[in-house]
Amino acid sequence: MAITKKNLIAFVFTILFVISYVHCRSTSDIVSGSGIKEDEHVCFKTSPCLPEVGGEKGCIAFCSRMKFTTGLCLGSVVCCCYT
């Protein structure tokens, strides 16, 4: 079976279409919803939120050491760190 110019062009366009489809699907799956990214956060049951350890400032310092942007105390034993 001979490969004609028409078949070769159809094959190349098919490959290009598949590659672009896979590329577009993989990037669009990263952004979900309306495009507004909520803050990612992690909560720790630690003592920085206790008043004698520092309270809110202690939680912020703890989160800064953990490479987060900020921290927020939930009660006196839970410190939530946000990116």
Swiss-Prot record:
Signal peptide: 1-24
GO biological process terms held by the UniProt record: defense response to fungus; killing of cells of another organism
Compartments in which it is found: Secreted
Source organism superkingdom: Eukaryota
This protein's GO CC annotations: extracellular region
Predominant location category: secreted
Keyword annotations of the record: Antimicrobial, Disulfide bond, Fungicide, Plant defense, Secreted, Signal
Covalent S-S links between cysteines: 43-81, 49-73, 59-79, 63-80
Family, similarity comment: Belongs to the DEFL family.
Protein name, UniProt field: Putative defensin-like protein 110
